[in-house]
Amino acid sequence: MHKIGNLWLIGTSHISPESVKEVRKVILENEVDIVAIELDKGRFLSLMGKKSKIRIREIRRIGVKGFLFMLLGAWVEEQLGKVVKTKPGAEMKSAVKAAAKIKARIALIDQNINITLKRLFKEITWKEKFRFIWDIVKGVVLRKQEIEGFDLRKVPSENMIAKLVDKVKDRYPSIYKTLIHERNIVMANRLVKMMQREEDKKIVAVVGAGHVRGMMEIIKKKI
């Protein structure tokens, strides 16, 4: 967790029971005024069970490739979540429930998923697509022992996260650019505006651990 000005920035793992507990603890103990989460409106409604059906017009909006990529990502998270008996996004739900308990305001700071997926499939190369699919197959089938040796219940160390993000940047530059870097800019800028507009308010932001380093660099430059 990082503290800067009136902001607490918490990096989480979307399938970690440890993240669920930490998020709830920080929000309740500090009695914050605003809880910002790494979701857009559509994903927020889906996570909270208020919007479960995927409509045809939504598939058209993000494209068939974007839709399939979204399903693949959700499936991978679900399989890993089963290992640790935690549903993907549980830490975001925990943040929302903790915010409701102390009557804190919820702020959705992520970029619209439709924009993100359109950007991804405009930038990604065939080479990266094949690498991505091969790495998933290799990870699930050939390196199961390595996954089992990694403690999915905990958020990896900052050093480990930095190495993983750098590896993504090197191996999948387009995926890094659209799924990490561009969203870092969007979320960090929204938080900076919020911090400046709500100077007297305590703000907790809950984002995936892979976003923290990049977001902190942007925030520090602008505060």
Pin down the residues of each PLM region.
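Compositional signal for N-terminal targeting/processing segments
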Residues: 1-223
